[in-house]
């Protein structure tokens, strides 16, 4: 009898592990694709005879399209199935790169960036909808953390992979080979049997759509929360090296070590945060506490001249705490999403990250142009304080259960 009862549990556990593995691989592809164009900028500049402004416009097109289509793709995810949307996104994104490799021109680059941005918009709503439907609630935080870590890993290895491809098969070949990864991963997910969101959930979502207002105050606050998270991290990630070199007397090697420590600690923090998210229901307080400490750390960096070892140590702690809150951040969205609307909820709030990616380079670039490198960290403090306040406001209170006689 014990063996008969244990078999379904093992099968369910195996299915959950297979699902998490497949979705995490897809998220790896998402972040890998984000870095394909930037890694090929020297090749594209030489081949197309354009400047970095023209190449930057391709990234702007990617970001705008990805940001504006997240919410509509979330709607499609809830109504037609997350698995279908995810597979199409993988295939379309890959074909965008393959097409550019077969016919390289500046107009083709812009078209490819637009299509790649559209494909990129599927991952968050589709991935989180599948994970929310098929992961054990007791391990949901850890599932979200592994999924996020896989994305971090995709971005981390992209430079090495693209450089190796350019060295072996050239720039055009690198585009084609990188593009082939998307369709191949789509076939892998089919072979692995990654499940869809259930037909019952989609039917319920469709039946309730006219009555259901997904754009709730909590979802809108979380969208702003995501944007503030992006803004608070973007200055450090993108302008941290130049700020440390110009304002703190730090050499390039030391600045690189400090930023690498910050990013590596963030990835480790994501995994640790998954265990924490599964052991508490107070996800907003976890996020607020971690970012509150980070705000103090960044304030110290902004106003004090610190020795390089201490500066690196503080950035390492800040990176770890920034990673720790990520699973709790995702749990806040899941808790705020109405039943059957996880795809739409994650699609809407993820636009906050996309728009922070548009605004942050302008803001922090202006700060550096004004020769105020300390304000790269000072502005991050402001955004972190606002993030702390929103984390506390947006935490959804558990419903009160009426007492029974």
State each model region's role.
Residues 2-14, 196-222:
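Juxtamembrane intracellular "pre-TM" segments in multi-pass secondary transporters
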Residues 35, 63-71, 155-156, 263-267, ...:
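Residue-level signature of mid-helix packing/kink "hotspots" within the transmembrane helices
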Residues 68-104:
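Conserved MFS/SLC helix-loop-helix module at the cytosolic interface between two early adjacent transmembrane helices
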Residues 69-81, 270-282, 368:
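Helix-to-loop junctions at the C-terminal end of transmembrane segments
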Residues 84-98, 285-300:
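Structural signature of the two symmetry-related core transmembrane helices
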Residues 112-150:
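Cytoplasmic helix-loop-helix junction between adjacent transmembrane helices
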Residues 147-193:
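Helix-loop-helix hairpin linking two adjacent transmembrane segments in secondary transporters
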């Amino acid at each position: 009898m014990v063996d008969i009862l244990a078999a379904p549990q093992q099968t369910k556990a195996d299915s959950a592990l297979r699902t998490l593995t497949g979705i995490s691989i897809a998220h790896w592809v998402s972040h890998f694709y984000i870095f394909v164009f930037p890694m090929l900028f020297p090749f594209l500049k030489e081949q197309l005879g354009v400047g970095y402004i023209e190449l930057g416009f391709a990234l702007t097109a990617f970001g705008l399209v990805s940001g504006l289509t997240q919410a509509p793709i979330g709607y499609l995810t809830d109504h037609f199935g997350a698995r279908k949307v995810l597979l199409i996104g993988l295939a379309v994104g890959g074909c965008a790169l393959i097409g550019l490799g077969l016919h390289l021109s500046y107009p083709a680059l812009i078209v490819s960036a637009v299509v790649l941005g559209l494909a990129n918009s599927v991952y968050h709503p589709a991935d989180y909808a599948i994970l929310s439907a098929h992961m054990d609630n007791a391990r949901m935080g850890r599932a979200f953390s592994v999924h996020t870590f896989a994305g971090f890993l995709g971005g981390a290895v992209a430079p090495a992979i693209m450089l190796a491809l350019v060295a072996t098969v050239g720039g055009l070949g690198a585009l084609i080979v990188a593009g082939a990864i998307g369709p191949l991963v789509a076939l892998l997910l089919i072979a692995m049997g990654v499940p869809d969101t259930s037909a019952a959930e989609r039917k319920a979502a469709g039946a309730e759509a006219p009555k259901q207002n997904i754009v709730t105050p909590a979802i809108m606050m979380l969208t702003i929360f995501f944007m503030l998270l992006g803004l608070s991290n973007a200055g450090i990630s993108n302008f941290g090296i130049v700020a440390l070199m110009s304002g703190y007397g730090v050499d390039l090697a030391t600045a690189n070590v400090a930023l690498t420590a910050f990013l590596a600690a963030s990835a480790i923090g994501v995994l640790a945060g998954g265990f924490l998210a599964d052991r508490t229901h107070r996800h907003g307080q976890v996020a607020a506490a971690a970012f509150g400490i980070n705000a103090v750390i960044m304030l110290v960096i902004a106003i004090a001249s610190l020795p390089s070892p201490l500066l690196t140590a503080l950035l390492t702690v800040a990176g770890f705490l920034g990673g720790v809150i990520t699973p709790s951040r995702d749990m806040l969205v899941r808790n705020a999403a109405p039943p059957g609307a996880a795809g739409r909820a994650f699609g809407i709030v993820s636009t906050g990250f996309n728009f922070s990616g548009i605004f942050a380079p302008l803001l922090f670039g202006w700060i550096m142009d004004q020769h105020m490198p300390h304000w790269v960290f000072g502005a991050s403090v402001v955004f972190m304080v606002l993030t702390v306040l929103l984390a506390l406001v947006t935490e959804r209170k558990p419903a009160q259960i009426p007492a029974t006689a």
